[in-house]
Curated annotation (Swiss-Prot):
Residues 2-146 form the Globin domain. Keywords: Disulfide bond, Heme, Iron, Metal-binding, Oxygen transport, Transport. CDD domains: Hb-beta-like. The gene is hbb. Displays a strong alkaline Bohr effect, and at low pH exhibits the reduced ligand affinity and cooperativity that comprise the Root effect. The keyword Iron-sulfur does not apply. Red blood cells. Heme b binds at residues 63, 92. This is Hemoglobin subunit beta.
Amino acid sequence: VEWTDFERATIQDIFSKMDYETVGPATLTRTVIVYPWTLRYFAKFGNICSTAAILGNKEIAKHGTTILHGLDRGVKNMDDIKNTYAELSKLHSEKLHVDPDNFRLLSDCLTIVVAAKMGKDFTGEVQAAFQKFLSVVVNSLGRQYH
């Protein structure tokens, strides 16, 4: 993947300003509320039987933060994202049996949450760079499935 200077700077800027403890939980809770079939991966997280329960579930919130911190690895290794996520791809494919399309659903929800936080600063150019980054990460996470 070729990255322009603007794309690199944009991705690094977004993640350097991101409040992981807010954006991560908001992203994962949005994902499991909008796409309820994704809840099957989180059954061990306790009460997730309603929107209110999901919004108040500390394990969902914690895992959302963990997911977001996992994206840091991609930000720090933008020139080698595929290898950066090879182990996680294998884990999600072989052990957790996560449908790889769910990575895209999560990235779509992350885009919505980030856009809401950034407001007018989330221009078309910024969104294009952000979604390009997420697309490369999603493809890398799904790599083990092929």
